[in-house]
Amino acid sequence: MARRTNTRKRRVRKNIDTGIAHIRSTFNNTIVTITDVHGNAIAWSSAGALGFKGSRKSTPFAAQMAAEAAAKASMEHGMKTVEVNVKGPGAGREAAIRALQAAGLEITAIKDVTPIPHNGCRPPKRRRV
């Protein structure tokens, strides 16, 4: 058998100054993906990827840390301004937006793109605590 050589793909530093920050905030986690204007991912992070486990993933602090990590990674590629798309009902929505701004990214627009059903699937039953 032929031996496979260890060829790892090197990260190419792209020079992209404007992009879109997609914040997906669910009841269990917050995922921040920063893309270029065409939708190609440049950097991403999530509360779970940063080591938060269980109920700590759904906190605003975890969302803040995820947004900071994604912002720092995108700024290495030359990102300066972002448009923010927020999706979902989670606790980390506002915290993630504030963290992107605090990290040094200029926010040009904030859009709520939460999908709303026109009476689609039956929702989960109400919790009784």
UniProtKB/Swiss-Prot annotation:
Pfam families: Ribosomal_S11. InterPro entries: Ribosomal_uS11, Ribosomal_uS11_bac-type, Ribosomal_uS11_CS, Ribosomal_uS11_sf. GO terms for molecular function: rRNA binding; structural constituent of ribosome. One of its GO terms (cellular component) is ribonucleoprotein complex. PROSITE patterns: RIBOSOMAL_S11. Keywords: Ribonucleoprotein, Ribosomal protein, RNA-binding, rRNA-binding. GO terms for biological process: translation. Transmembrane segments: none annotated. Located on the platform of the 30S subunit, it bridges several disparate RNA helices of the 16S rRNA. Forms part of the Shine-Dalgarno cleft in the 70S ribosome. Part of the 30S ribosomal subunit. Interacts with proteins S7 and S18. Binds to IF-3. Belongs to the universal ribosomal protein uS11 family. This is Small ribosomal subunit protein uS11. It comes from Geobacillus thermodenitrificans (strain NG80-2). The lineage of its organism: Bacteria, Bacillati, Bacillota, Bacilli, Bacillales.
